[in-house]
Amino acid sequence: MVLMILPIIGSVSVSEGLVAIVTLCLVYMLMKYKHTEIPEGLKRLPGPKPLPIIGNVLEVYNNPHLSLTAMSERYGSVFQIQIGMRPVVVLSGNETVRQALIKQGEDFAGRPDLYSFKFINDGKSLAFSTDKAGVWRARRKLAMSALRSFATLEGTTPEYSCALEEHVCKEGEYLVKQLTSVMDVSGSFDPFRHIVVSVANVICGMCFGRRYSHDDQELLGLVNMSDEFGQVVGSGNPADFIPILRYLPNRTMKRFMDINDRFNNFVQKIVSEHYESYDKDNIRDITDSLIDHCEDRKLDENANIQVSDEKIVGIVNDLFGAGFDTISTALSWAVVYLVAYPEIQERLHQELKEKVGMIRTPRLSDKINLPLLEAFILEIFRHSSFLPFTIPHCTIKDTSLNGYFIPKDTCVFINQWQVNHDPELWKEPSSFNPDRFLSADGTELNKLEGEKVLVFGMDKRRCIGEAIGRNEVYLFLAILLQRLRFQEKPGHPLDMTPEYGLTMKHKRCQLKASMRPWGQEE
């Protein structure tokens, strides 16, 4: 998301432009002659030579995940590029990434002080915040406690093991009806369009305790806001890397700030309503759970760092935004892969038919008996690598990695796409093959292989909603596979070339779906 620098859109006078150019040149000259002392015994970071002002932007502008993967083959798993005026260290390779994020996790646990981060959730975002370690840990602990509490929240009826299972199963069943209805009317459907609304509904249910009809304007407004956010963030903000540009007119940045303001206001309204109706003995959703844990901390005299009520809004905002885009993108890719590999689709259906049957809806408890489905999900994560990079990291002190010196406050990119396609780690990485994650006889999931897949980050900055996200993808997909057969629409061949952005999505397409014999054994 931050690897692109686009032209500044807006009316800039000639005098303003000249002042900006002169200033940029002076800053560049100062930076050029600034010398970083390398401690004895350590090496200077390798990397391509940057151009004045713009750095290496032209070399990484198009498909940065591929450009930086090619650079890693030349410079190694630790190298440096320059985006605008900001040095950026790029990490590739499974061992190097694990060394940095797990064994040296404290050193790389920061977030860079990027200009655009200040406007996400009013600067209170848990994922993007540059808060000091103690404050960030307190907020992360609060969020994780709230998620654990929600994970054990009971459903409204005994047939569901938990609230999450109830939300996803009901919405998954409704999605099946929606797709069959659209097929009756139009003869084909856009998978992303319908999946994104269903996922948004589940997230609304989990975070806010609300479920909407699929044509509800408030729900569709949230979907549109998320799409706008992804487009704007995916195109990048030049001011993150050329500081002087933040003082010039920038329509893209104005739009970015407007989207954040609108969504913050929406979440603030719902959180305020939750405070008014909050009942400690009746926790309804994640927002209630956050309020509950926040109230407990206020009563704890031993709590060194208190989390303000307003930061609850930021945490809810993060959970909604991250879960919404990630899950909808993963599920949409899954349906496209099912169409591209019909023989795998039939194997998955047969597994569900044998282990679950065609009478009842799949449950979370069935997951352990569906190794092929779990392997399929892992291979979607690996092969599509729809999250090609983690949110940028930052070093919180001078450190070293693989013998190279990395100064404090250095921006760090983690190339997840490279790790997921590294020929030293995977056999035939360009091939889509779920069996790579199964035991030799195909009856068990190889968890050690599965742990190599990078999608949710690692260790201290690992996505806190990972467990919920994985379960959501599994349940949705199990229900769809059990009841529907997906096919390519004649005359509309699939194009699986990913489109780079905040999350990499497949090109929009039209597919067909037909009902399998539901409610009876085939």
Swiss-Prot record:
One Gene Ontology CC term in the entry: cytoplasm
A GO term, aspect molecular function: heme binding
Induction: By 3-methylcholanthrene (3MC).
Membrane topology: Peripheral membrane protein
Source domain of life: Eukaryota
PANTHER family: CYTOCHROME P450 1A, STEROID 17-ALPHA-HYDROXYLASE/17,20 LYASE
Residues passing through the membrane, by range: none
Homology family: Belongs to the cytochrome P450 family.
Positions of substrate binding: F229
Protein name, per record: Cytochrome P450 1A1
Pfam families from the UniProt entry: p450 (PF00067)
Subcellular location: Endoplasmic reticulum membrane; Microsome membrane
Gene3D superfamilies from the UniProt entry: Cytochrome P450 (1.10.630.10)
Predominant subcellular localization, coarse grouping: endoplasmic reticulum
Gene: cyp1a1
UniProt binding sites for heme: C463
EC code(s) of this entry: 1.14.14.1
Function: Cytochromes P450 are a group of heme-thiolate monooxygenases. They oxidize a variety of structurally unrelated compounds, including steroids, fatty acids, and xenobiotics.
Cofactor: heme
